[in-house]
Protein backbone atom coordinates (compact mmCIF):
# COMPACT_ATOMS: atom_id res chain seq x y z
CA UNK A 1 0.00 0.00 0.00
CA UNK A 2 1.34 3.42 -0.92
CA UNK A 3 1.44 6.00 1.83
CA UNK A 4 2.39 9.60 1.38
CA UNK A 5 4.97 11.85 2.96
CA UNK A 6 3.73 15.19 4.28
CA UNK A 7 0.66 16.54 2.54
CA UNK A 8 2.08 16.07 -0.95
CA UNK A 9 0.18 13.11 -2.35
CA UNK A 10 2.57 12.95 -5.30
CA UNK A 11 5.47 11.84 -3.08
CA UNK A 12 5.24 8.16 -2.08
CA UNK A 13 7.17 6.87 0.94
CA UNK A 14 9.99 4.37 0.53
CA UNK A 15 9.03 0.83 -0.57
CA UNK A 16 7.79 -1.44 2.19
CA UNK A 17 6.11 1.27 4.22
CA UNK A 18 2.40 0.98 4.75
CA UNK A 19 -0.39 3.53 4.67
CA UNK A 20 -0.96 5.27 7.99
CA UNK A 21 -4.30 5.91 9.62
CA UNK A 22 -4.27 9.59 8.59
CA UNK A 23 -3.33 8.72 4.99
CA UNK A 24 -1.49 12.06 4.80
CA UNK A 25 2.01 11.19 6.06
CA UNK A 26 4.11 8.22 7.08
CA UNK A 27 7.27 7.33 8.92
CA UNK A 28 8.75 4.42 10.86
CA UNK A 29 5.97 4.62 13.45
CA UNK A 30 3.39 4.69 10.69
CA UNK A 31 4.96 1.62 9.14
CA UNK A 32 4.75 -0.24 12.44
CA UNK A 33 1.10 0.73 12.88
CA UNK A 34 0.29 -0.40 9.35
CA UNK A 35 1.76 -3.90 9.73
UniProtKB/Swiss-Prot annotation:
Keyword entries, A-Z: Acetylcholine receptor inhibiting toxin, Disulfide bond, Ion channel impairing toxin, Neurotoxin, Postsynaptic neurotoxin, Secreted, Toxin
Tissue: Expressed by the venom gland.
GO CC annotation: extracellular region
Disulfide bonds: 3-20, 26-30
Localization terms from the record: Secreted
Domain of life where this protein originates: Eukaryota
Record-level Gene Ontology MF annotations: acetylcholine receptor inhibitor activity; ion channel regulator activity; toxin activity
Role according to the record: Binds to muscular nicotinic acetylcholine receptor (nAChR) and inhibits acetylcholine from binding to the receptor, thereby potently impairing neuromuscular transmission. Pseudo-irreversibly inhibits the nAChR through competitive antagonism. In contrast to other long-chain alpha-neurotoxins, lacks affinity for neuronal alpha-7 nicotinic acetylcholine receptor.
Family to which this protein belongs: Belongs to the three-finger toxin family. Long-chain subfamily. Type II alpha-neurotoxin sub-subfamily.
Protein name per UniProt: Alpha-elapitoxin-Aa2a
Source organism (scientific name): Acanthophis antarcticus (Common death adder)
Species lineage: Eukaryota, Metazoa, Chordata, Craniata, Vertebrata
